[in-house]
């Protein structure tokens, strides 16, 4: 009986947090846990934090969010999750229960977004993930209807990659063997699982398949083994520090497979700055359209504010998600989280990507593997 009572109290507490009255509020408190240190810091400081800072500045420069007929400024609270899932969960709990934030931004990375998902759901906060890729997105969107998955599924990326590799094989430019490595984190686990099936179904053979722990600095043994496998194609589902190391250490080892597909980081501005001509032809996830005036204007603003360009994959999608959140809040007219979630589920939004309407809490049309873009 006591157990049922405690559960009921917990449910009531979550409901109260979700619908707490905010009449006459003089600020909107937004909080987030983000990887300022640890192996995820590179991705967070390139793709995520600049978008948060730029969007908040732009909204506050207008006087704030339009709520109840007046502009209400945003106040930000942040914690360093240290690239640790347990720390991220504790920080998000603290933001909700102690700091009493009105809204939450998501952390960086697939693993951390999966870790904090139950907390966002428990308290009824919208979770717009734009640095998480998983084939579980459709299932999670049903389990956590407050969650929104902006980067697509692993299968979508693998289907695109397999299509390209199949054409190259048909044209006689590559053989059937693939060497694959993957980081032992949510991103690498999910994508490598989808890749094994996709490659096998398309008649390719994995001549080498190895995972490595997050934080691994010396990847030269894996490069050597991939090189000795004789595979024409090398695929790495890597995080930014690994992507940089793989590019550098492959050059040292004179490893130049006919196709090199690397993970997160290839689209970072520092990648081309660091590797120059050696970056030509390296493939990765995502892409960027030169012909989209809105994303070009976004990139210019990003460069002016941070003295560097945005990530050519998740940044534009992340900024679009913040524009969607802003429009949803202003349409609802108050910080009513259930109503904001409903608007995100059903509304159509004007963003740097163009008009966006989510399907089953997922963005469907903005992901594909691509040759490293030039803007």
Model-flagged regions — what are they?
Residues 50-76, 171-173, 202-203:
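Signal peptide-proximal N-terminal region
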């Amino acid at each position: 009986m006591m157990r049922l009572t405690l559960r009921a109290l917990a449910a009531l507490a979550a409901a109260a947090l979700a619908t707490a009255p905010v009449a006459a509020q003089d600020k909107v408190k937004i909080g987030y846990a983000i990887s300022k240190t640890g192996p995820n810091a590179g991705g967070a400081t390139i793709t995520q934090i600049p978008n948060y800072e730029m969007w908040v500045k732009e909204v506050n420069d207008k006087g704030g969010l339009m709520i109840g007929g007046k502009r209400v400024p945003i106040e930000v609270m942040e914690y360093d999750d240290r690239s640790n899932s347990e720390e991220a969960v504790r920080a998000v709990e603290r933001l909700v229960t102690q700091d009493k934030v009105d809204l939450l931004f998501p952390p960086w990375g697939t693993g951390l977004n999966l870790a904090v998902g139950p907390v966002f759901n428990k308290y009824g906060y919208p979770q717009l993930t734009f640095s998480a890729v998983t084939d579980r997105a459709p299932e999670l969107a049903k389990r956590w209807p407050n969650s929104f998955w902006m980067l697509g599924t692993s299968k979508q990326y693998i289907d695109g990659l397999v299509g390209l590799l199949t054409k190259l094989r048909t044209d006689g430019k590559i053989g059937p063997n693939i060497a694959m490595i993957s980081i032992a984190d949510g991103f690498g686990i999910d994508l490598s699982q989808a890749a094994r099936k996709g490659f096998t179904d398309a008649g390719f053979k994995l001549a080498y398949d190895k995972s490595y722990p997050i934080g691994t600095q010396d990847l030269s043994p894996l490069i050597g083994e991939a090189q000795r496998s004789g595979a024409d194609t090398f695929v790495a589902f890597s995080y930014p520090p690994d992507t940089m190391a793989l590019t550098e250490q492959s050059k040292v080892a004179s490893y130049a497979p006919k196709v090199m597909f690397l993970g997160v980081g290839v689209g970072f501005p520092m990648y081309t700055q660091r590797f120059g001509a050696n970056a030509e032809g390296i493939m990765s996830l995502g892409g960027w359209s030169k012909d989209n005036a809105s994303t070009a204007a976004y990139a210019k603003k990003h460069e002016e504010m941070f003295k560097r360009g945005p990530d050519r994959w998740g940044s534009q999608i992340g900024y679009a998600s913040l524009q969607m959140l802003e429009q949803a809040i202003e349409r609802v007219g108050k910080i009513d989280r259930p109503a904001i979630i409903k608007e995100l589920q059903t509304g159509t939004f004007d963003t740097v990507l163009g008009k966006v309407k989510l399907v089953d809490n997922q963005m469907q049309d903005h992901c594909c593997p691509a040759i490293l873009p030039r803007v």
